[in-house]
């Protein structure tokens, strides 16, 4: 039985997400898989690539052949170089920058708010109306 490591497609119409699976070479693209060994989300920035290195090494050692897209993913993660014994086994996987925690964001916003000058909000239209009303009432009293 010829075994291949290939991608099965998941996700919506314009948002593809793939699973890296081990399956018989004769099965359909989204057909029955022997084992799921990772996932690949190409639309994220940077692309999410999670592959179980230990299982990939096992399947490659027993003769499973990766498809071309999967081989490119294995080269990025460094698993293909490790299997072939090539230099540069670290791969070129880009890692997403860590998001700041909500507590850190809150503390930064609080510190920025404390540094701002404290002054009451001024709405000249409302004050002008009050001043005009006060002036009219004093004029009316003076006229009487």
Curated annotation (Swiss-Prot):
Entry annotated with the keyword Plastid: no
Molecular-function GO terms, alphabetical: structural constituent of ribosome
Cellular component terms per the entry's GO annotation: cytoplasm; small ribosomal subunit
Span list, region Disordered: 115-144
Coiled coil regions, renumbered to chain: none
Keyword Ribosomal protein attributed: yes
Keywords from the UniProt entry: Ribonucleoprotein, Ribosomal protein
Any one GO biological process: translation
InterPro entries per the UniProt record, alphabetical: Ribosomal_bS16, Ribosomal_bS16_CS, Ribosomal_bS16_dom_sf
Entries under Pfam families matching the protein: Ribosomal_S16
Similarity-based family: Belongs to the bacterial ribosomal protein bS16 family.
Descriptive protein name: Small ribosomal subunit protein bS16
Organism: Nocardia farcinica (strain IFM 10152)
Lineage summary: Bacteria, Bacillati, Actinomycetota, Actinomycetes, Mycobacteriales
